[in-house]
Regions:
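Catalytic-domain carbohydrate-binding cleft regions of carbohydrate-active enzymes
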Residues: 1-221
């Protein structure tokens, strides 16, 4: 796949997005380092390990390998879907997965009973503050000044309608935040832009593998 991207588009990936393997080995980090990757993002790590690393602000680290180290970002919560990416409360974050507005597919509505709604001039202040509260809480788990908030899930962005819902509503909040919370810089971004900024952070060095995997008590995969 890497060679195909290079031969077809002249692009060589520099950052890895690995959100769904059930655990992560040190060999994975070594192979990516040998291939020239600058950083990697991982998600499925034992929930108790995540908790311990979050308490120490060690969810970003330099993963040590026999061939060098690679900057690694570990997502902090249960899953990589919309309800589990903006902050610690999925019942709130789900309200900002705007693909759930109106008719949809399997992701219609939120299982916590609080639905996503369109952002308007009448609710933008309240909605933005509620979203930012979650973002601030997530930021406390990391040492750096940059916060990564992925927007999506499995099988997403298959229609222009969904993309419009997501980007239009987030842009309305971003516009409000830029005016009313000028101390923050907020924008749509890419994984590479995030890593280029986050790598400036002084992070710990860790080694070893993240096995076995469990996402909740006694549920081992």
């Amino acid at each position: 796949g890497r060679e195909w991207l290079q031969n077809t588009f002249g692009i060589t990936p520099q950052y890895s997005w690995a959100i769904d393997p059930f655990g992560h080995s040190a060999g994975q980090a070594q192979v990516l380092k040998e291939l020239g990757y600058k950083g990697m993002l991982i998600q499925r790590v034992h929930y108790a390990v995540k908790k311990q690393l979050a308490e120490k602000q060690q969810l970003e680290f330099q993963w040590q390998t026999p061939v060098g180290e690679i900057f690694t970002h570990m997502m902090p919560f249960y899953s990589y879907d919309g309800p589990h990416t903006c902050g610690p409360d999925p019942s709130i974050c789900c309200q900002f997965d705007f693909a759930r507005i109106g008719k949809g597919k399997t992701w219609t509505g939120c299982p916590w009973g609080k639905m996503a709604v369109e952002i308007t001039e009448h609710n933008v202040a309240e909605r933005s503050r509620k979203w930012l509260d979650q973002v601030y809480k997530k930021a406390m788990l990391y040492r750096g000044k940059h916060v990564l908030i992925p927007i999506g899930d499995d099988f997403r962005y298959q229609t222009m309608e969904e993309a419009h819902k997501q980007f239009t509503n987030y842009q309305r909040m971003f516009d409000w935040i830029k005016v009313n919370v000028p101390s923050l810089s907020i924008s749509f971004s890419t994984l590479s832009r995030y890593f280029d900024a986050a790598r400036e952070t002084n992070v710990p060095k860790l080694q070893g593998s993240f096995f076995p995997y469990s996402d909740r008590e006694k549920d081992y995969w």
